[in-house]
Amino acid sequence: MTKYVFVTGGVVSSLGKGIAAASLAAILESRGLKVTLLKLDPYINVDPGTMSPFQHGEVFVTEDGAETDLDLGHYERFISTKMRKANNFTTGQIYESVIRKERRGDYLGKTVQVIPHITNEIQAFIERGAASATCGEPDVAIVEIGGTVGDIESLPFLEAARQMSLRLGRNSACFVHLTLVPYVATAGELKTKPTQHSVQKLREIGILPHVLLCRADRRIPDDESKKISMFSNVPEDAVISVWDADSIYKIPQMLHDQGLDRIICEELKLSPKDADLSMWSALVEKLENPKQEVTIGMVGKYVDLTESYKSLIEALRHASIHTSTKVNIEYIDSEELETNGVDSLKHLDAVLVPGGFGRRGTEGKIAAVRYARESKVPYLGICLGMQLAVIEFARDVVGLKQANSTEFDPDTPERVVALITEWYDREGKVETRTEESDLGGTMRLGSQRCPIKPGTMAEEIYGKDVNERHRHRYEVNNRFVPQLEAGGLIISARTPSEDLPEMMELPRSMHPWFVGVQFHPEFTSTPRDGHPLFRSFVEAALANKQARGVQA
């Protein structure tokens, strides 16, 4: 039978519940347990797919095509279990499901209320999510409840967790509470009062945490831990200090050293083998001792909030581990390139243009593409970054001066990039879209496998085929492909059913390393294995740096 660990947060948001939950999962997996994770989001949106990156950060796409919270990306990077749509749900989905049932008459004329109907539905979603784990029936399901204790939006989820722990019985569920212990510089001390009040709030609704994870900018002294223990009624050895680390991959060892996994296993009456965190130690060792260094420019419009590119940043970090290279990322606002030109790119070893939406900043990104192509600087374009690379090539090499995407200019006569109106999903079902379709949940989403053209750089990187995740509405228009190919551009991968261009590149006679991909390879990169595309990109940046050094 699956046992549950509920992870809650207090005092403020953005303390790192997702990292804490994923780190605990990594330790338990290293002890031989089958583990899955779920994220419960209290907002009323059905999913984060239409939310601004400034509001929500990155939207992580699962293999089965769900648009989910960025924490699911952390989950997949820390454990081997793949996430699915059932691993993330929102208040919006819960209410949508309950209202559908009410309309069908499933409640037999009863008054539908938050308790028991909403809380029962939350419990059903949790158990369904755990049961659908790709690892088979999990030994432990770690359930991260979004928001902060005390928020009105989180109350139904906390109540559902309380009811569920009572229903499952002793040693079947436990609670881990992550809270802030701020350092007040003027007083020169850590303050435990916010943590005391946060635990008090939990106790008011009937939840007694078994473990406290105390976030601070430094390790919490023993006397402060004793005070927290006394006022929160949590054993002193279960008051665990979680201080700021320069790498998230150090957190599993930090938590294990303080006995978190031992406490959880004792509470849940589990007797697994000892933890083996040697893989994590080796990763950290490689990360901290690089043999070389490169600087990569990431040109986007969400650069003030790097959470928007969380998986991409981690994928570059994974490549740094597997190439023994320190990767410095410079975030470059594409709108500034429109105003000030591309001089700020000239010291870079490589240029990356990530995915994005909307017209704002696109001409700055196109300027970055042109600079990379003409200066023979390694270029990687992801999703929109590939589309803009094709547009730049069409304009400046092929001579289609009005080439554009219908996303930015619906009236352009040279629709090099246009809306996909029909495609097959990963199950082979035909999906159709029009300009009038809803925005939510109407993109091409999820994994799809497609063959790679022999003799290409794509084949050198991936092999005979590629299986990556997608999140896009627009696609390179096949009507213009013959002209693009005549100019030298190579379409190196296409979807098998609809013949949609998936990868493009320039031949080495034109450029040493210039690649665009319509999919999002960052979603499948892990610290354990890295990713072949990002590894190749970093190696190309190294080669460019060395070549420039020889010339200098």
UniProtKB/Swiss-Prot annotation:
GO terms for biological process: 'de novo' CTP biosynthetic process; pyrimidine nucleobase biosynthetic process. Pathway: Pyrimidine metabolism; CTP biosynthesis via de novo pathway; CTP from UDP: step 2/2. Disulfide bonds: none annotated. It catalyses: UTP + L-glutamine + ATP + H2O = CTP + L-glutamate + ADP + phosphate + 2 H(+); L-glutamine + H2O = L-glutamate + NH4(+); UTP + NH4(+) + ATP = CTP + ADP + phosphate + 2 H(+). UTP binds at S13, K191, T192, K193, P194, T195, Q196, K227. Mg(2+) binds at D71, E144. Coiled coil: none annotated. CTP binds at S13, D151, I152, E153, K191, T192, K193, P194, T195, Q196, K227. It comes from the Bacteria. Its EC number is 6.3.4.2. Gene3D superfamilies: 3.40.50.880, P-loop containing nucleotide triphosphate hydrolases (3.40.50.300). Allosterically activated by GTP, when glutamine is the substrate; GTP has no effect on the reaction when ammonia is the substrate. The allosteric effector GTP functions by stabilizing the protein conformation that binds the tetrahedral intermediate(s) formed during glutamine hydrolysis. Inhibited by the product CTP, via allosteric rather than competitive inhibition. The active site is at C383 (nucleophile), H520, E522. Residues 1-270 are annotated as: Amidoligase domain. InterPro entries: Class_I_gatase-like, CTP_synthase, CTP_synthase_N, GATASE, GATase1_CTP_Synthase, P-loop_NTPase. L-glutamine binds at G356, L384, G385, M386, Q387, E407, R473. It is an enzyme of class 6 (ligase). Transmembrane segments: none annotated. Belongs to the CTP synthase family. Catalyzes the ATP-dependent amination of UTP to CTP with either L-glutamine or ammonia as the source of nitrogen. Regulates intracellular CTP levels through interactions with the four ribonucleotide triphosphates. Homotetramer. CTPSs have evolved a hybrid strategy for distinguishing between UTP and CTP. The overlapping regions of the product feedback inhibitory and substrate sites recognize a common feature in both compounds, the triphosphate moiety. To differentiate isosteric substrate and product pyrimidine rings, an additional pocket far from the expected kinase/ligase catalytic site, specifically recognizes the cytosine and ribose portions of the product inhibitor. This is CTP synthase. It comes from Burkholderia cenocepacia (strain HI2424). The lineage of its organism: Bacteria, Pseudomonadati, Pseudomonadota, Betaproteobacteria, Burkholderiales. The gene is pyrG.
